[in-house]
């Protein structure tokens, strides 16, 4: 009986540690994504967004992964900095949801430079041991 309890305890502990590790990986991915947007690192952005990724802007406009990364590369979306205020991450197996609140300084779609209180809600999937963004919805807070 003691052996069974020990095995169950170790199994539960492993699951809890894995969930924490996943949350840490997702938090890092979120912060790094903003750094990559500022640096216009399209290679990394391409790697961390799934091929079927879709961004829904606060206006309701949808951008595919290719359109989104192209807009960053050509300056349609110019990101200058991001100060992260809050993240909430929920992990369920190989799927996760991240809601991040950041003060983002950007100039978008021909507008002037402005600091936005931007909330992004992401859906993520873990493929081959790596977390990827599959969907994002932008709003303000």
Place the predicted regions along the sequence by residue.
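A mature extracytoplasmic/lumenal domain signature
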Residues: 49, 59, 83, 88, ...
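Short beta-strand edge/turn micro-motifs at domain boundaries
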Residues: 117-141
């Amino acid at each position: 009986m003691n052996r069974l309890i020990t095995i169950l305890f170790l199994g539960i502990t492993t699951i809890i540690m894995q969930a924490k590790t996943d949350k840490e990986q997702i938090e890092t991915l979120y912060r790094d994504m903003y750094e990559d947007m500022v640096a216009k690192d399209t290679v990394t952005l391409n790697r961390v967004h799934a091929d079927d990724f879709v961004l829904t802007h606060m206006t309701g406009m949808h951008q595919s992964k290719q359109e989104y990364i192209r807009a960053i590369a050509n300056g349609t979306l110019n990101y200058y900095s991001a100060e992260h205020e809050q993240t909430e991450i929920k992990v369920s197996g190989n799927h996760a949801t991240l809601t991040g609140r950041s003060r983002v300084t950007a100039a978008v779609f021909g507008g002037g430079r402005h600091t936005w209180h931007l909330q992004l809600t992401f859906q993520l999937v873990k493929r081959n041991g790596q977390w990827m963004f599959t969907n994002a919805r932008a709003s303000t807070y």
